[in-house]
Regions:
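Interhelical loop/hinge segments that connect adjacent transmembrane helices in multipass membrane
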Residues: 1-7, 122, 183-188, 200-241, ...
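Membrane-interface junctions at transmembrane-helix termini in multi-pass inner-membrane proteins
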Residues: 8, 135-159, 348-378
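Transmembrane helix-bundle signature of multi-pass secondary active exporters and lipid flippases
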Residues: 44-59, 237, 241, 249, ...
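Helix-loop junctions and terminal segments of transmembrane helices
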Residues: 59-74, 150, 267, 271-292, ...
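Interfacial segments at transmembrane-helix termini and the short loops linking adjacent helices
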Residues: 105-130, 254, 320-347, 351, ...
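Hydrophobic alpha-helical transmembrane segments
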Residues: 158-208, 378-382, 396-420
Length: 427
C-alpha cells in the first residue's frame, strides 16, 4: 500500500484552505464594491495591502519558534518553554506596535493615500489606524499556524484560517444587506475581525496549557537571537513584494488600482496552492536537514519546483481562456480590459516566484539567512526604482516589468547558488 507523505496531506488541507480564503476575497469584491463604491473600494484595497506589512508584527518569532519546535521534535525533547516565551514576546510586540501606530497613523496615511478626494483623505487617519490594529493582531496571531505546522498538525491551522475568513465573508454579506451604505471602517472590521480574533483565542488556550512551564532568560534570548534574522528577511521581502502597492497609490488611478489588485487576487488564488506546499514542506525540510538526509531533500525540492512551474503555466492558460467569465462574476460593470501581454508577464512572474520562494524557504529552514540580508536589499532597490519608472510610462504592465526585473537580477540566481554552497559544506 502506497503511503502518502504527511506533508502532502497537510498541503492538501492547505490547498482547500487557501482556495476558500482566496475565493472569499474574490467574491467579497463584488459586495464591497456595491457597499463602498469605486473610489472608496480603491482606498480599502490599498489599506488591505497593509496586512502583508504587519505580518512582521510577530518580529520573526513565529519562524524562529517553528524551527526550534522542528529541531526539538527531531531530538524528542519538550518545547513548551519556547511556546510560553514566544507568547510573552508577542504580547509585548502587540502593545508596542499598537501604541506607536496610534501616534503615527495620521502622518502615514497622508503619505500613503494621496490620490483620492478630500472627503476620503480627511478620514484616512482613522481608516489607517483601524486597519493597522486589525492587521497587527493578525500578524501576532499567525504564530499559531507556525506552531501547528511545526507539530505536523497543519490541518488544524488550515481549519482555523479558513473558518476565520468565512466568518469575515458572512459579516460582509450581512452589512451588504443590512447596512448597504457602510463606511470603510465597517468593511474592514467586518472582513478582518474574525481573522484577527480566532488565532488569538487559540493562543490563549495554548498559553493555559503551558502556564506552569518554567521559562528561563536563555529561552527568550535564543528565540530573539534567531528571530532577528527572520525579521530582517521578512521586512526586506515585504518591501520587495509590496512596493507595487506603494507605486499604485502614487501612480495609478482608482480604476487601475482595482483592475490590478483583482487580477493579482485571481492569480494569488492559484499561487496560494503552491505556497501551501512550501508551508507544509518547511518543517519536513528542517527535519531532513537535522538528519542529514540531503539526497531525499534535493529530490523533494526538484519535484516541487517542476510541478510548481507547470501548475503556474496551466493555471494562467485557464484564467486567460475564462477571463471574461471570471471578471464578470467578481465585479460586473467594472471595465477589466486587460491585454494578453499582462497574462504572459504574470505567468513569467509567478514561475520565477516558484523558483525563488522554494530556495528562500530552504534557506530559512536551515537558519541560513545572511545571503538574504545581503541580496534582498538589492532586490528591493531595483524593484522600487524600476516599478516607479515603468509604471509612469506603462501603467500596470510597467509594475510587472519592475517585479520581474527585481527577481531576475538578484534572488533568481543568488539563492540557489548559496543553497548549493551551504548544503555541500553541511553534508
Amino acid at each position: 500500500m502506497v503511503r502518502i507523505p504527511r506533508h502532502l496531506i497537510i498541503a492538501a488541507s492547505s490547498w482547500l484552505s487557501k482556495i476558500i480564503i482566496a475565493g472569499v476575497q474574490l467574491v467579497s469584491v463584488k459586495f464591497l464594491l456595491e457597499i463602498l463604491g469605486e473610489e472608496s473600494y480603491a482606498v480599502f484595497t490599498l489599506l488591505t495591502g497593509l496586512l502583508v506589512w504587519f505580518s512582521i508584527a510577530d518580529i520573526g518569532i513565529g519562524s524562529s519558534l517553528q524551527n526550534y519546535i522542528s529541531e526539538l521534535k527531531a531530538d524528542r525533547k519538550s518545547y513548551d518553554a519556547y511556546i510560553k516565551a514566544a507568547i510573552h514576546i508577542l504580547f509585548a510586540s502587540l502593545i508596542i506596535l499598537s501604541s506607536t501606530l496610534f501616534f503615527l497613523s495620521d502622518k502615514l496615511s497622508s503619505l500613503y493615500l494621496t490620490s483620492f478626494s478630500d472627503e476620503l483623505k480627511n478620514n484616512s487617519g482613522s481608516y489607517f489606524f483601524i486597519a493597522s490594529i486589525l492587521f497587527i493582531f493578525i500578524g501576532v496571531g499567525s504564530v499559531v499556524y507556525k506552531i501547528l505546522f511545526a507539530e505536523l498538525l497543519g490541518w488544524k491551522a488550515n481549519i482555523i484560517n479558513a473558518l476565520s475568513y468565512l466568518l469575515g465573508f458572512l459579516d460582509v454579506v450581512a452589512i451588504h444587506y443590512l447596512m448597504p451604505d457602510s463606511s470603510i471602517t465597517f468593511a474592514l472590521v467586518a472582513l478582518y475581525a474574525p481573522v484577527a480574533i480566532l488565532p488569538i483565542i487559540y493562543i490563549s488556550f495554548r498559553y493555559i496549557y503551558v502556564l506552569k512551564t518554567k521559562v528561563n532568560f536563555n529561552t527568550y534570548k535564543l528565540l530573539l537571537s534567531r528571530s532577528s534574522g527572520f525579521l530582517i528577511f521578512s521586512s526586506l521581502s515585504i518591501i520587495v513584494l509590496q512596493t507595487d502597492y506603494i507605486v499604485m497609490s502614487q501612480k495609478l488611478s482608482a480604476a487601475d488600482i482595482i483592475k490590478y489588485t483583482v487580477t493579482m487576487k485571481i492569480f494569488g488564488l492559484m499561487f496560494f496552492i503552491y505556497t501551501a506546499v512550501l508551508q507544509a514542506l518547511w518543517p519536513v525540510c528542517a527535519e531532513l536537514r537535522v538528519k542529514m538526509q540531503w539526497g531525499k531533500l534535493h529530490r523533494i525540492i526538484f519535484l516541487n519546483i517542476i510541478g510548481g512551474v507547470f501548475f503556474v503555466g496551466l493555471g494562467t492558460l485557464f484564467i486567460y481562456v475564462l477571463k471574461d467569465y471570471i471578471y464578470s462574476i467578481i465585479a460586473n460593470g467594472i471595465d477589466y480590459n486587460i491585454s494578453g501581454a499582462v497574462f504572459v508577464l504574470l505567468a513569467v512572474y509567478f514561475s520565477i516566484r516558484v523558483w525563488c520562494d522554494t530556495f528562500a524557504m530552504l534557506l530559512q529552514s536551515m537558519n541560513q539567512l545572511k545571503i538574504l540580508w545581503l541580496i534582498v536589499p538589492c532586490q528591493a532597490l531595483i524593484g522600487g526604482v524600476t516599478q516607479w519608472y515603468f509604471a509612469e510610462h506603462y501603467g500596470i504592465v510597467g509594475i510587472l516589468y519592475g517585479l520581474i526585473l527585481s527577481f531576475s537580477l538578484t534572488v533568481f540566481w543568488g539563492l540557489p547558488v548559496y543553497y548549493m554552497y551551504k548544503s555541500k559544506r553541511l553534508a
